[in-house]
């Protein structure tokens, strides 16, 4: 998801903005993420029913490309809501997150990215980053966890759990070396302007 331009929302609307993240049908994170209590439709309706809110529904890139099914079939009757903007095209998700007030996910990793940007995240399933006191958990976590800071969650996820390999040398490297290579080699993408 690092291969597209930043998004710029062009709108005169001043309402509270909620970003709702679609996931592909059959995604293991949905299957094993305790998503029985709420459906994708329930999550979207919860967002749409918030007073004075505009909802941005981001379709999964693989769904938008026609490679996998998403959840649009369950929400066709909601697509004409005046406070709903559907984004199907691929874009830099962090640039979109920075322009909203909060993020709703089932179990998508986008919720973790939103936490790292400082946005409130509501989880309608149980992703690995829920239950630590950082998210609004709509589904209770079965095994209570201790409170964590965003920094501690980041360290556990990216520094302790992951191994990094340099894209050129294919040798183990630090996260900093990997990020530096990505920044230096990322092609320039024109910003994507979305009017609403």
Tell where the protein language model's regions lie, with residue ranges.
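Short loop/turn segments at strand-loop or loop-helix junctions that form parts
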Residues: 15-27, 59-61, 126
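Histidine-anchored nucleotide/phosphate-binding helix
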Residues: 20, 33-50
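Short catalytic/ligand-binding loop motif for oxyanion handling, primarily in non-cytosolic enzymes
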Residues: 27-30, 63-67, 112-113, 130-133
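Catalytic donor nucleotide-activated moiety binding site of glycosyltransferases and closely related
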Residues: 44-88
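A donor-sugar binding/catalytic signature common to diverse glycosyltransferases
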Residues: 89-135
